């Protein structure tokens, strides 16, 4: 295989990877030959996923981790450093949470919940992984952002959008600051994707129809459609792409007005 399209011999950490988009990312990374460590807050889901990956012959290990805890983040990175001999090629900051409310109804706990999970954890993981990424000689960071960080999606709430917009900016900053260390940073911004977390939205007929009417492809995304882009950004073939926020949204963010029927 052309080395540009292989992750053979490379190592990766994916957060929140026992289900949903994170699970799909692990499957895609493993398919390209990467060795992967994952973390998840649910021990039950994590163990189930690890068993499934073992049956498929994937090189995946895992740790239970509450990413909102600074000591647990530090412990996780110590584990990763030990497993991968002080080197890491890929960091995928996938963990994300959402409490959808009108802005006037958010309380202090909601603010802390979003910031600590969606933003602070990703920021700290980048700091902790920097020496490992630099030592590897080829580092790639991918943030799982959202179209909510690019355009206003009122139904997702302003706090969620705030944290995702911040991740997009963090990708730009790190791309410039850490390029000299051989590290690239990008963000992927999906539309609504079919996962357990999005069911509250997709089961509401009026919300779903409203979203699909503004999405040229007329549907929600699939986890593997997001995973394929994430993994592409980690491949040597994408070595000149950094600092970008790429929307994978069925055309939502470019939709203006059209009298033509959707797909």
Swiss-Prot record:
EC code(s) of this entry: 1.1.1.-
Residues the entry annotates as binding NADP(+): 13-37
Leading EC class: oxidoreductase
Positions of substrate binding: 146
Signal sequence region: none
Gene Ontology molecular function: oxidoreductase activity
Active site: residue positions: 160 (proton acceptor)
Alphabetical UniProt keywords: NADP, Oxidoreductase
Family: Belongs to the short-chain dehydrogenases/reductases (SDR) family. SDR65C subfamily.
Protein name per its UniProtKB record: Tropinone reductase homolog At2g29300
Organism of origin: Arabidopsis thaliana
